[in-house]
């Protein structure tokens, strides 16, 4: 049985984490499959946006597969870093820097690595049944897939530390109020709302969308002056393209009507 489901309709891909018996916990095979699928979809010009969700009614992802991770820890620090941390950080970096709009459609619990994927995703919608938590401290280690870095940038240092140090979950509405997700939707409407959002973005120039994603993501981790240089470079990259000319021409034509 595949651990990752994929479907593409009308230029929108839906990837579904599919380990329902394990609450879609991320074992190494699933992390690798997700990374490979993201690469394939990014290279496909027919795909304009990607939605990532979880299988079943209970979970987006309960986090890392702890029994598998435990074996890596038993092998020592270097093995744990190689097999677990670097693999997971590589995935969340890939998601954060994705050149197409990637929407996390969080359909249930998003604990540990599931929360870290949500943090990395450029956009996120949450079912009203979703819950988010950083339970790693209960297992004796800090969040290892980027959670100590991205969460404070998203929600602020104090809110992030409260989640990280207490391991207490928050509900979907709390997640939206602090900026972890864009908004909350009814559980049964989650995928349709995610597709609607993807479609709203996909109608724009793919090159312009990619430039916006790069400008915002790269600018987050540099000074404002460096960020402005990134923004200018992304604008300049669009000037030679037909996209900008078509967009300006369409705007001017409407004004003349």
Q: What is the meaning of each model-derived region?
A:
Residues 54-91, 110, 140, 223:
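Glycine- (often His-adjacent) and acidic-residue-rich active-site loop
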Residues 21, 58, 67, 149, ...:
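Glycine-centered loop/turn positions within well-structured domains
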Residues 93-207, 236-237, 241, 246:
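Crotonase-fold acyl-CoA enzyme core
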Residues 22, 180, 256-257:
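Activation segment of ePK-like protein kinases, specifically the conserved APE
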Residues 1-53, 79, 86, 90-93:
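Conserved CoA-thioester-binding segment of acyl-CoA-metabolizing enzymes
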Residues 15, 19, 34, 52, ...:
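Terminal peptide-recognition signature
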Residues 1-10, 57, 167-173, 192-257:
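C-terminal alpha-helix plus adjacent terminal tail
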């Amino acid at each position: 049985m595949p651990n990752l489901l994929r479907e593409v309709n009308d230029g929108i891909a839906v990837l579904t984490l599919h380990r329902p018996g394990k609450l879609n916990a991320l074992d190494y095979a699933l992390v690798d499959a997700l990374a490979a699928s993201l690469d394939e979809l990014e290279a496909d010009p027919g795909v304009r946006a990607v939605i990532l969700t979880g299988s079943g009614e209970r979970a987006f992802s309960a986090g890392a597969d702890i029994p598998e991770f435990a074996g890596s820890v038993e092998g020592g620090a270097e093995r744990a870093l190689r097999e677990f941390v670097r693999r997971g950080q590589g995935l969340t970096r890939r998601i954060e820097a994705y050149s197409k709009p990637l929407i996390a459609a969080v359909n249930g619990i998003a604990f540990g690595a599931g929360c870290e994927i949500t943090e990395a995703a450029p956009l996120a919608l949450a079912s009203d049944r979703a819950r988010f938590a950083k339970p790693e401290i209960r297992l004796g280690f800090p969040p290892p897939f980027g959670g100590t870095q991205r969460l404070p940038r998203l929600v602020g240092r104090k809110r992030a530390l409260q989640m990280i140090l207490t391991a207490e979950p928050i509900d979907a509405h709390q997640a939206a109020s602090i900026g972890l997700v864009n908004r909350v939707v009814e559980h049964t409407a989650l995928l349709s709302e995610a597709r609607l959002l993807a479609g709203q973005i996909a109608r724009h120039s793919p090159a312009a969308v990619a430039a916006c994603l790069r400008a915002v993501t790269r600018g987050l981790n540099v000074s404002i002056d460096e960020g402005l240089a990134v923004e200018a470079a992304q604008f300049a990259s669009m000037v030679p393209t037909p996209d900008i000319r078509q967009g300006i021409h369409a705007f001017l034509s409407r004004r003349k009507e």
